[in-house]
A protein has these predicted regions:
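Extended alpha-solenoid scaffolds built from HEAT/ARM-like alpha-helical repeats
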Residues: 2-329
């Protein structure tokens, strides 16, 4: 009786296996070479849609590795591959892969299984965040003008921020940088994409957080015609004089005031304490400074908005004094 010969792996599979291995290499140079090889040997225009889906699935899965080097390598490769997919296949669903399929793969490959360890769950949430960032950087959803899938991706990011508070600042930073990127590419980016970020943060009760504050300020500056929600900040401006106490509380990552109509917007959990100053402080201080500086002179343009000195007195010195009294009592 003759034995069946083992089926030899196809050359393409062997090539991909080598690329995946090098994407996880500790050497940044090796990782970049591997990403370049992936784009060269399996460029989207000459690769079947089925093969492209297999590659994208493997890249998303690689983001869930416990090795930092692997997450970095797979993240770069995924971002660049999605960019090339847009360029070579175009934004049309007929030629490329619909945004819904890409979000499906992200969701499926980065969902931790029920019986997994805490470390494995942590790795999967990191993978989900890195994957979401890769999709954002590739501009796939904007190019396909798929607002529905954009909102779906925002739900995934907000879900990470609420479920894992120690990732909340990273989630906010990715969305803040996304709004800045939108602003740089305006008017090709519709206001609806920027507005959706604010709306989803509001829906997930993350708008009155340092991250939500920074994003709101950036959206209001970059997309002045976007109709922001009315019931979050007075006059739709976090720097309104009437909101100075709330502004100070948010910047300290404290719970916001709990009047009946404000309870819905209170901060959801505190982020892990860090000696590093939150990026929202830079955003607020820069906005206050630019409000006062006109033609090289300090001029307050809007009397309804707080000045830098008032902010410093109420939000910084006031909080410090309050803490000193608390600890000395």
């Amino acid at each position: 009786m003759s034995r069946k010969r083992k089926r030899e792996p196809e050359p393409a599979m062997l090539t991909l296996a080598g690329i995946y291995e090098k994407l996880a290499d500790e050497s940044e140079d090796q990782r970049l070479r591997a990403a370049h090889s992936l784009l060269k040997d399996f460029e989207p225009r000459s690769t079947s849609i089925d093969q492209i889906k297999v590659i994208i699935t493997r890249l998303f899965r690689g983001l869930c590795s416990s090795r930092k080097a692997a997450r970095l390598g797979y993240s770069v490769a995924l971002t660049e591959y999605l960019i090339e997919l847009n360029v070579q296949r175009g934004a049309s669903i007929e030629n490329g892969i619909p945004a819904s399929s890409i979000i499906d793969i992200l969701d499926n490959e980065t969902t931790p299984e029920g019986n997994n360890s805490g470390q494995d769950e942590r790795d999967h949430y990191f993978g989900r965040l890195f994957g979401a960032e890769a999709i954002i950087k590739s501009n796939t959803l904007v190019k396909q003008q798929d607002l529905l899938q954009w909102k779906r991706l925002l739900d995934l990011i907000c879900g990470i921020a609420n479920k894992k508070p120690w990732l909340k600042q990273e989630c906010g930073w990715i969305l803040y940088e996304c709004i800045k990127s939108f602003a740089a590419n305006e008017p090709s980016v519709p206001d609806d994409f920027a507005l959706a970020v604010v709306e989803k943060l509001t829906a997930h009760k993350l708008i009155r957080t340092p991250e939500g504050l920074a994003i709101w300020l950036e959206v209001s500056k970059a997309f002045p015609h976007a109709k922001l929600p009315k019931d979050v900040w007075k006059h739709r401006d976090p720097l309104s004089k009437k909101d100075i106490t709330l502004l100070a509380d948010v910047l300290k990552d404290a719970k916001s005031r709990t009047n009946s109509d404000e309870e819905e917007h209170k901060s959801q959990g505190k982020a892990v304490w860090s000696v590093q100053l939150h990026f929202a402080w830079d955003v607020v201080l820069a906005r206050l400074y630019s409000n006062e500086l006109v033609n090289g002179k300090h001029i307050q343009k809007d009397h309804k908005v707080i000045t830098l000195s008032v902010f410093w007195e109420k939000a910084v010195e006031g909080k410090i004094s309050h803490k000193c009294l608390f600890y000395s009592s």
